[in-house]
């Protein structure tokens, strides 16, 4: 009942406040997690995601090709990822945090907080119906000779207090159009509306990867039918 009361016109910079599209994206996420035995929650996920994405979701997804073309240093890609002017970012929040420092694979402190070669092989470096990691527009970053892997998406901002002492801050896109699309795809899947789910996954993979093959429920089923189940010695995404 509170969603229609949100007024974007009262904000100077809408993306830094709980705006209307962010609220509907939150509702889509909430109802996806609030699973009912009969999956009656899923239609609400679809309805709220539709408000966020409109009739053509692809035009609102992140431009992953543009992001991947930027330098993967500690600032350029992460700053572009959290940019409030990016069409995919619906709500950008700030926090006093050192998380970008400990989670980025380029920092020495992150060994316990980012992917290693084994966990990366079943996540950011895994193979999907769109191909392997070489098909991604944004390639997972790994320092030379290191087992650390991950995407560079967060940057630490420093507020110096005195001398060399400083407080760390971060910006984080709490809700994005890409997530809203994937929430809708999962809701379609739970409702056994597989063609619509595959269409959403296809829209996402064409934004995130270089693959131009259209994904269908048949091609997705064929890929995962051939994939071996996970074992500790040979991890995969199929559990």
What are the residue ranges of the model-derived segments?
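Surface-exposed charge patches in extracellular/virion surface proteins
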Residues: 87, 193, 217, 238-239
């Amino acid at each position: 009942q509170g969603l229609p009361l949100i007024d974007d016109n009262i904000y100077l910079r809408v993306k830094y406040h709980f705006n209307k599209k962010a609220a509907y994206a939150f509702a889509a996420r909430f109802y996806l997690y609030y699973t009912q035995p009969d999956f009656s929650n899923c239609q609400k996920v679809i309805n709220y995601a539709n408000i966020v994405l409109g009739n053509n979701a692809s035009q609102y997804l992140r431009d992953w090709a543009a992001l991947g073309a930027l330098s993967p240093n500690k600032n350029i890609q992460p700053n572009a990822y959290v940019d409030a002017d990016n069409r995919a970012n619906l709500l950008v929040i700030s926090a006093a945090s050192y998380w970008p420092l400990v989670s980025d694979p380029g920092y020495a402190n992150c060994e316990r907080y980012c992917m290693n070669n084994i966990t990366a092989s079943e996540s950011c470096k895994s193979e999907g119906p769109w191909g392997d990691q070489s098909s991604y527009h944004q390639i997972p970053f790994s320092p030379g000779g290191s087992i650390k892997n991950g995407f560079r998406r967060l940057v630490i901002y420093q507020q110096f207090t005195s001398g060399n002492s400083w407080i760390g801050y971060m910006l984080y896109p709490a809700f994005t159009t890409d997530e809203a699309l994937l929430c809708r795809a999962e809701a379609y899947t739970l409702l056994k509306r597989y063609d619509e789910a595959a269409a959403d996954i296809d829209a996402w993979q064409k934004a995130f990867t270089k693959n131009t093959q259209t994904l269908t429920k048949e091609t997705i089923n064929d890929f995962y039918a051939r994939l071996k189940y996970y074992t500790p010695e040979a991890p995969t995404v199929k559990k």
